[in-house]
Amino acid sequence: MDEQKSCRNKCIFCFIDQLPKGMRESLYFKDDDSRLSFLFGNYITLTNLTQHEIDRIIKMHISPINVSVHTTNPQLRCKMMHNRFAGDALRHLESFAKAGISLNCQIVACPGINDGDELLRTFTDLEKLGVNMTAVVPVGLTKYRQGLYPLTEYNQETAAQTLDIIEKFGDECVKKYGRRIFYAGDEFYIKANRPIPDPDFYEGFPAVEDGIGMIACLKEEIEFAVEDSEYNDALNYKVTMACGEAVAPYLRDMMKIIATKFPNIEINVVAIKNNFFGGGVNAVSYTHLRAHETD
């Protein structure tokens, strides 16, 4: 593959813009390449696609395409992405949908900007397009936001309000189509202080790498692993597991599942405060755990 296409936007919530200096160079590259979307599941904004590329995707039926939508309000999308063409790029969604291209969508929800009524509008528009899946995750804010657009984090009340919208719309889709389609990131449940849904809720975990159902998926895997393991009283040791603050309570509960069958194994879960990015960044608390599990 030739040189990767970089992002032409300057989104108000961009995580890369919130990184400190001095990290490895590859972390600062903003990819926005449709080829990587198909090959590796990267999300693209559609703002740098040429008509030739659109035609090629449709002709070759390159599917699925993962799209960072954020909002279907053209004016608001331009504002959120600091790109005057961002609203016009939404028309590509309809072109892909008409061509039978499967669309997986992502929405980074920002309090008071693209949630509430705007989120309902986006859901309604995406439902009409027949998208395959839409993941909604809360904006992540680091302590390195000097000079950037003023954003606020979700608190328990606002997270619960947004979660209600997502779950209600998803419930309606289950009734109409037999599939949920619209999912909330695990962080919404954590911030709203609500229980993580059971694995069946996630219908095969279509967006687990986006933080959708990651906790439920890990718990299910542990349950299966324990069930398939034979009891061995010779297993007698202590383990210390370090993780982020957000996931620590859930991991402690999961370790009890192991202790039930292997009482001689003592697992101590230690929560580590994220001083590097700041306390507002919680996704890495369990996303990195999951990533290292597959290394």
Name each model-derived stretch.
Residues 113, 130-157, 177-199, 273-279:
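Flexible glycine/acidic-rich beta-alpha junction loops that bind and position SAM and/or redox cofactors
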Residues 22-24, 145, 191-193, 250-252:
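Short helix/loop capping segments that flank catalytic or ligand/cofactor-binding pockets
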Residues 68, 106-108, 137-139, 185, ...:
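Generic beta-strand/beta-sheet core signal
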Residues 166-243, 261:
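Hard-cation-handling environments
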Residues 96-101, 127-132, 173-176, 261-265:
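Secondary-structure transition/capping motifs at alpha-helix termini
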Residues 1-129, 140-169:
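Conserved Radical SAM active-site core
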Residues 236-286:
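Redox- and metal-dependent alpha/beta enzyme cores, enriched for Fe-S-associated oxidoreductases
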Residues 287-294:
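Conserved small/polar residues in nucleotide/adenosyl-binding loops
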